[in-house]
Amino acid sequence: VLSLQTLNRHQNQLDLIFYNSKTNNTSVVLKEIDKAYVDITDNLTFLEDNSFIWTSEKDGYNHIYHYGKKGKLINQVTKGNWEVTNYYGFNEKNNTIYYQSLENGSINRDVYSITLDGTNKKRLTKNTGTNDADFSANFTYFINTYSSATQPPLYTLNDAVNGYVFKTIKTNSELTKTVSEYKMSKKEFSTININGNDLNMWMIKPANFDAKKEYPLFMFQYSGPGSQQVANRWNNANDYW
């Protein structure tokens, strides 16, 4: 059986289709329909029993789902008012899914593991900021790339079971030292209410900021897709304004 995905011209309906090469028959096993658009991913993962893992925004947030081989929903693996921002894969030996999400705040990223039935969820990264993972082929280890608004990228080798740090690969300590020698203000995160919605924002004040004085304001904003600008991560360019 061959699987394929089709998207209509408006990009708001995606069909997951199975094609049987022996019978030359096709069947639509799953439909994704949205008023605006449907994101395409490479997250489709087939299991030994021909069931499959799928990610979808159908409940308003991007989450992980487990479907039977005929497209019947078995269970929603992750759920909550937060997004799964990266699906790393599935380890069939221990029945575990690995993913990145916003569960620790929408400006942060953490790496998690969870069993296929939605239980035994573990946060594998401990530092608040942006964490990303590159897993070994057998999901035994992962290299964690961590940074924050004040911490340059830190690379560690971690245990995929509990997140234990086996080894620090690169600290960027020299960069940290160099940056500390400059009198730069820290990035301040907060929210602003626009039309009833709390939107994330950040502000960098002058190093000698005086609340009694008025200062010119420079605003930076970009609304391209998949381009979150307010994030607790290291920015080696724009933060030097």
Predicted regions and their residues:
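Beta-strand C-termini and the immediately following turn/loop, strongest in propeller blades
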Residues: S3-H10, I17-N20, T45-D59, Y67-G68, ...
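Structured core elements
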Residues: S3-L4, F18, V28, T45, ...
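Hydrophobic helix-coil surface modules that form long, contiguous segments used
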Residues: R9-L14, T23-K31, G226
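Extended, hydrophobic alpha-helical segments in both membrane/secreted and soluble proteins
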Residues: N12, N25, I40-N43, F52-W54, ...
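A short loop-to-beta-strand structural motif that recurs across blades of beta-propeller domains
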Residues: D15-I17, H63-Y65, D110-Y112, L154-T156
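Multi-bladed beta-propeller domains
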Residues: Y19-N43, G68-N91, L102-N104, I114-N131, ...
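Repeat-solenoid scaffold signature
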Residues: N95-I97, N108-T145
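Serine-hydrolase catalytic core recognition
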Residues: T130-W241
